[in-house]
């Protein structure tokens, strides 16, 4: 019997702005999932939150993209959104981009990470959930976990990991994916994933047997909705131990609070701060971007746990550095590199400002006109 782990999240409304999920909305979602468990649709579940995002962690035997499981999640979000509206919570139902369910929640707003696995004798997993950032935020940590021996010594000293891992990288603008193997193709891999707004690691497999090791939600809300409706706040499932990164190696990848896009109004770079459940809320400048990690064991579809992975003084220095970096970045105000690059601002007010001012721009004959970027050329010409 194969077990499917599904992590589905959505911003359905939050208390005091983009701050924290209200417990009454979690209770509403719990009723829906409890009913689904009684009916045998799901085997087990756990509900949590990161900032303003409601997180549903479910196990079942129905495979990925199952209609009944996704409908259960959709109904849970809809019921939670109703409560949010009754309470007058901010941005109630923000991530629910459609009024009706159509088979699965892909493209409807919620973020989805799922993996169908053959359970090992012991199946430890870590589930990472971020707020105020986008899927590419996991590119650097995933590279560290599965391709960097300075982070993961198991790549060197564990015979079952020595063959390396391959990365499925998605071009979110073109909807195309490429598989790149490490260590053989790490330079090509880095050339792509170093542009995380466009190239996102979606899945990681072990080279020797194609064992699925990690999966990331890749929904870009602005690309789905055609306008800014909030950041994507990605989730990620990582399998651990027994020929995969140890828990400590997976967590080590987040010891450096690297800069990620998102933060205030989804338009600023800031440090990704790993936090405990009690600190998984947006505060300063609607952030800084937060990361919650929960650890489980999965046994016959049952979720054993969780444990709060970043609730430990070992990450105090990471958080301290994140606060220093946050302060440094904030002092740039509305200037780059704190503010995102123009291509990432096209779903904010910037296009409206340019439209308003277009008649006031005058041609200057003695000024050299810069060439288009390589990405602008690609998008104007398309692929053959």
UniProtKB/Swiss-Prot annotation:
Tell me the active site. 11, 228, 231
Q: So where does Mg(2+) 2 get bound?
A: 52-53, 131, 233
Q: Does the keyword Metal-binding apply?
A: yes
Q: What's the superkingdom here?
A: Archaea
Entry GO MF terms: fructose 1,6-bisphosphate 1-phosphatase activity; fructose-bisphosphate aldolase activity; magnesium ion binding
Query: Which amino acids does the record list as binding Mg(2+) 3?
Result: 231-233
Summary of pH dependence: Optimum pH is 8.0.
Cofactor(s), names only, from the UniProt record: Mg(2+)
> Changing residue 131 to A: reported impact?
2-fold increase in FBP affinity and 10-fold decrease in FBPase catalytic activity, leading to a 5.5-fold decrease in FBPase catalytic efficiency
The family note in this entry says: Belongs to the FBP aldolase/phosphatase family.
NCBIfam families in alphabetical order: FBP_aldo_phos
Q: What is this protein called?
A: Fructose-1,6-bisphosphate aldolase/phosphatase
Q: Which organism is it from?
A: Sulfurisphaera tokodaii (strain DSM 16993 / JCM 10545 / NBRC 100140 / 7) (Sulfolobus tokodaii)
Gene encoding this chain? fbp
């Amino acid at each position: 019997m194969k077990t499917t782990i599904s992590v589905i999240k959505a911003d359905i409304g939050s208390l005091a702005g983009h701050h924290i999920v209200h417990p009454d909305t979690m209770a509403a979602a719990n009723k829906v999932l409890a009913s689904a468990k009684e009916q045998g649709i799901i085997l087990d579940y756990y509900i949590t939150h990161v900032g303003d995002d409601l997180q549903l962690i479910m196990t079942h035997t129905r495979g990925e993209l199952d209609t009944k499981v996704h409908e259960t999640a959709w109904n849970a979000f809809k019921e939670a959104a109703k409560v949010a509206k009754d309470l007058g919570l901010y941005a109630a139902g923000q991530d629910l981009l459609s009024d009706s369910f159509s088979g699965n929640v892909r493209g409807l707003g919620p973020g989805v990470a799922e993996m169908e696995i053959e359970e090992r004798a012991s199946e430890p997993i870590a589930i990472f959930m971020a707020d105020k950032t986008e899927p590419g935020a996991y590119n650097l940590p995933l590279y560290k976990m599965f391709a960097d021996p300075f982070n993961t010594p198991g790549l060197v000293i564990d015979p079952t990991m020595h063959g390396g891992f391959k990365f499925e990288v998605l071009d979110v603008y073109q909807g195309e994916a490429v598989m790149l193997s490490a260590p053989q193709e790490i330079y090509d891999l880095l050339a792509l994933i170093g542009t995380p707004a466009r190239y996102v690691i979606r899945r990681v497999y072990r080279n020797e047997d194609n064992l699925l090791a990690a999966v990331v939600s890749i929904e870009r809300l602005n690309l789905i909705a055609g306008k800014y409706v909030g950041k994507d706040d990605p989730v990620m499932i990582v399998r651990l131990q027994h020929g995969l990164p140890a828990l400590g190696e997976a967590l080590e990848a987040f010891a450096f609070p690297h800069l990620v896009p998102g933060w205030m109004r989804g338009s600023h770079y800031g440090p990704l701060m790993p936090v405990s459940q009690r600190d998984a809320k947006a505060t300063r400048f609607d952030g800084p971007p937060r990361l919650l990690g929960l650890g489980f064991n999965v046994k016959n579809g049952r979720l054993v746990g969780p444990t709060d992975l970043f609730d430990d003084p070992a990450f105090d220095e990471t958080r301290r550095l994140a606060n220093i970096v946050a302060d440094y970045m904030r002092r740039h105000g509305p200037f780059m590199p704190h503010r995102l690059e123009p291509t990432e601002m096209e779903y904010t007010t910037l296009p409206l400002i340019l439209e308003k001012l277009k008649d006031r721009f005058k041609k200057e004959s003695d000024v050299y006109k810069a060439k288009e970027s390589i990405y602008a050329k690609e998008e104007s010409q398309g692929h053959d």
